[in-house]
Amino acid sequence: MSHPEHSPLGKASAYKTQYDPSLLFPIPRQAKRDEIGLAAGSALPFFGIDLWNLYELSWLNLKGKPQVAIGTVIVPADSPNIVESKSFKLYLNTFNQTKVASSEALQQLIHHDLSEACGAPVQVRIVPQEEFARQKMGELAGLSLDRLDVETDVYQPTPGLLHADQDESPVEEVLVSHLLKSNCLVTGQPDWGSVQIRYVGAPINQEGLLKYLISFREHNEFHEQCVERIFMDIQRQCRPVKLAVYARYTRRGGLDINPFRTNFNTPWPDNLRNARQ
């Protein structure tokens, strides 16, 4: 089993410039799912994706001329593994001095290597330079929780802050906060994110929800794990009929990770780069 502390995170790394898929470091999802009460072998109470954007993607064509592109990768939430982000960056850097016949050949290589590491088929798209001008930006839609003037001193995840008024009629709401901050599981470096919560059910107390999201501020966990913890805590404490949680984290090392989890059929969220990304 690959443990996070054995990954390249927090260690001096040699930056190889020739293709080397062995640098990818998979980490099983199950250990962290055990912590939130999701037993191995049981059906997951959600489905979804981890959406990665690759902003520092470069290789050489067969004439030795550098090529640049943006990449997107979609990893299914039911894959047994995630890929540790620094190892992903180091892997992508190995293309910098590697000759590749075409962007299609590059896409196929990345698809093969990441699918092997994640233990499930992933989707890979290469956005060529000619399409850069068509890339859009946007913010998460929804009612801002950050408008609330809350007072708090709780900075570790506290599900007890969450509650819904089960005596009220069900509502359908989309709530957003830009105050999500957690820390890397291994290095403790800050991870900054925006989160969108879409639900149908008894009205969730918005002040309690905002305090709960703020409570991740000193919590050490990877992005994907934080989003699954948020999903499960809201589901258990507030019991919505439908729930979807989508977070967009700021980039590090040329990568950003945007996990999405839902328990109802809905289109995957738009991959719109936020202002902070």
Curated annotation (Swiss-Prot):
It comes from the Bacteria. One of its GO terms (cellular component) is cytoplasm. It is found in: Cytoplasm. The keyword DNA-binding does not apply. GO terms for molecular function: preQ1 synthase activity. NADPH binds at S85, K86, R252, G253. Pathway: tRNA modification; tRNA-queuosine biosynthesis. Its EC number is 1.7.1.13. Substrate binds at V83, E84, S85, H223, E224. Its main location: cytoplasm. The keyword Hydrolase does not apply. The active site is at C184, D191. It is an enzyme of class 1 (oxidoreductase). Keywords: Cytoplasm, NADP, Oxidoreductase, Queuosine biosynthesis. One of its GO terms (biological process) is tRNA modification. InterPro entries: GTP-CH-I_C/QueF, NADPH_dep_7-cyano-7-deazaG_red, QueF, QueF_N, QueF_type2. It catalyses: 7-aminomethyl-7-carbaguanine + 2 NADP(+) = 7-cyano-7-deazaguanine + 2 NADPH + 3 H(+). Catalyzes the NADPH-dependent reduction of 7-cyano-7-deazaguanine (preQ0) to 7-aminomethyl-7-deazaguanine (preQ1). NCBIfam families: QueF. Belongs to the GTP cyclohydrolase I family. QueF type 2 subfamily. Homodimer. PANTHER family: NADPH-DEPENDENT 7-CYANO-7-DEAZAGUANINE REDUCTASE. This is NADPH-dependent 7-cyano-7-deazaguanine reductase. It comes from Ralstonia nicotianae (strain ATCC BAA-1114 / GMI1000) (Ralstonia solanacearum).
